[in-house]
């Protein structure tokens, strides 16, 4: 019951009272529920004298799989409702299926995590025809939703899980090994195919991985730190595009906060050290499974395999259900080791778990309250309220969110709208140092222009344009800046560049910029 609450909250929790009500609220809700249920269940186990001798039921497939079945069903039902048009996904890129997430990647991760547990439950049904009917329905439903959400990575992850189950049913050891080898070759071939087949998407991935390689080469041993990717990626992307001879890649460059590959993220943030530690963990887990094979450990390995494949093309660890799935999968893989621990050791581990859960609540609850206050301030500012109350609210929250680039950016924006451009520059610069991205560079350029620091504005407009060459706004800002400074030759040069620039997305803003540039160039001939 406790695990079910955490799993369900990981997919349904949503609020409009937080700056990021779709993802952050899922983490906060699941975190509070997890810590609370751990404390309550541990206390109850002591009171009822079941404590460390509770037996293996807590780590059984049924106990662990049912919560993921519930979470998966919620995602499937929500997705089907969106597919019928009864409820809209309201996503700007036109995705029809989001199921309460901010991105189709959330749907893919939830289904990839839940699917192996659903198959494990179906496999335990006694009637053969019911078993195969449930499995078939699960496969068809999941594949259909992943196809509609355009998640090739999700389909590949589910396909790997299906093939692992097929191989698992083979009784002959030699045949099973041959089938496993074929599976490895097949997965490798599909991964290569997915990396090169869809030209636009995979050219974008190639750009990101190329920039990641540059970052890795600069810090190969220990990486750039915990948030190194978000701090430095866009600056590296600007340099990469400066020396890039391709005309395609600049058109694909965008504001990037994740490399769309969890392994690349580990390599950039933690270097070879992180990759080696990850590899050691994988090898130890596989070795333990091979030496202690059971139904429980096999289910755990299929979950880990699905997440591992999905991590090559997406960011499943952005979502709390993935983390919960990994923890439960590891419990199943190491179930025999855990059950063989002495009563004293298990009691000690339970005590440590309770203390960690209490510490988690002490940290999470004030953080959730601060997030709620920030959400209220954000709503007030979005409604046009840049008054003293909003500014005082941001000032009070600053010590708690001084390392959050999104908060600092919001704070700077509110200050700028209130006319306090010098203070806005300070917080925007802090945000840019924590997360160098296109939006903050453009804000710093506009703010410096308002302050009359035109040389700084020029540099940030140029940087924003180098980060995302496909965007028209930085060049137009530079065009207007040169016009105000009376630098006619440079103004005409930028104007011609704007007029001859390929348009990736035809919008009202782009048409307005093009018409304004044409008119001003005619006037200044």
PLM-predicted stretches and their roles:
Residues 86, 146-149, 154, 165-218, ...:
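A membrane-periplasm/extracellular boundary helix in multi-pass inner-membrane enzymes
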Residues 417, 450-451, 484-485:
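Register position in tetratricopeptide repeats
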Residues 278-373:
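Long, contiguous interaction/recruitment modules in multidomain scaffold/adaptor proteins
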Residues 1-70, 121-134, 166, 174-180, ...:
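Transmembrane signal-anchor hairpin modules in multi-pass inner-membrane enzymes, especially those
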Residues 90-95, 226-268:
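Interfacial juxtamembrane loops and adjacent helix segments
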Residues 7-14, 24-42, 56-93, 99-172, ...:
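Alpha-helical transmembrane segments of multi-pass inner-membrane proteins
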Residues 396-397, 430-431, 463-464, 497-498:
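Canonical positions in the second alpha-helix
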């Amino acid at each position: 019951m406790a695990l079910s609450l955490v799993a369900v909250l990981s997919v349904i929790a949503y609020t409009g009272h937080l700056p990021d009500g779709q993802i952050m609220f899922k983490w906060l809700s699941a975190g509070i529920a997890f810590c609370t249920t751990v404390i309550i269940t541990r206390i109850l186990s002591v009171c009822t004298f079941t404590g460390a001798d509770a037996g293996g039921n807590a780590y059984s497939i049924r106990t662990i799989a049912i919560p993921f079945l519930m979470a998966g069903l919620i995602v499937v039902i929500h997705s089907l409702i969106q597919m019928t048009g009864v409820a809209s996904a309201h996503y700007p890129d036109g995705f029809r299926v989001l199921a309460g997430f901010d991105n189709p990647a959330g749907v893919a991760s939830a289904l990839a995590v839940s699917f192996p547990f659903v198959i494990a439950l179906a496999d335990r049904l006694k009637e053969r025809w019911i078993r195969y009917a449930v499995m078939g329905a699960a496969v068809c439903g999941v594949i259909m939703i992943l196809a509609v959400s355009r998640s090739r990575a999700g389909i590949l992850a589910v396909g790997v899980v299906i093939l692992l189950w097929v191989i698992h049913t083979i009784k002959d050891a030699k045949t099973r090994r041959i089938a496993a080898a074929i599976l490895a070759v097949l997965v490798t071939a599909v991964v290569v195919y997915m990396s090169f087949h869809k030209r636009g998407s995979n050219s974008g991935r190639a750009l990101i991985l190329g920039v990641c390689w540059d970052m890795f080469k600069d810090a190969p041993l220990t990486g750039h730190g915990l948030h190194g990717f978000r701090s430095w990626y866009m600056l590296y992307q600007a340099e990469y595009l400066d020396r890039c001879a391709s005309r395609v890649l600049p058109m694909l460059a965008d504001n990037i906060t994740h490399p769309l590959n969890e392994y690349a993220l580990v390599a950039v943030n933690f270097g070879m050290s992180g990759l080696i530690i990850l590899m050691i963990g994988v090898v130890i887990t596989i070795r333990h499974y091979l030496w202690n094979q059971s139904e429980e450990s096999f289910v755990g390995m299929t979950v880990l395999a699905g997440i591992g494949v999905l991590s090559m093309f997406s960011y499943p660890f952005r979502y709390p259900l993935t983390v919960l799935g990994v923890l439960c999968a590891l419990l199943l893989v190491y179930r025999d080791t855990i059950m063989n621990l002495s009563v004293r050791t298990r009691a000690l581990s339970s005590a440590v778990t309770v203390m960690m859960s209490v510490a988690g609540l002490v940290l999470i609850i004030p953080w959730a309250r601060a997030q709620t206050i920030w959400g209220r301030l954000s709503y007030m500012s979005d409604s046009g309220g840049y008054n003293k109350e909003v500014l005082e609210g941001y000032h009070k929250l600053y010590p708690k969110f001084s390392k959050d680039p999104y908060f600092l950016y919001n704070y700077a924006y509110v200050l700028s709208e209130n006319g306090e451009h010098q203070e806005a520059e300070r917080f925007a610069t802090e945000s840019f140092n924590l997360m160098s991205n296109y939006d903050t560079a453009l804000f710093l350029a506009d703010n410096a222009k308002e302050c009359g620091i035109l040389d700084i504005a020029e540099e940030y407009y140029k940087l924003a344009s180098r980060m995302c060459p496909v965007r028209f706004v930085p060049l137009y800002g530079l065009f207007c800046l040169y016009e105000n400074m009376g630098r006619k030759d440079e103004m005409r040069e930028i104007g011609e560049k704007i007029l001859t620039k390929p348009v990736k997305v035809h919008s009202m803003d782009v048409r307005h910029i093009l018409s304004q540039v044409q008119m001003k160039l005619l006037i200044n001939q």
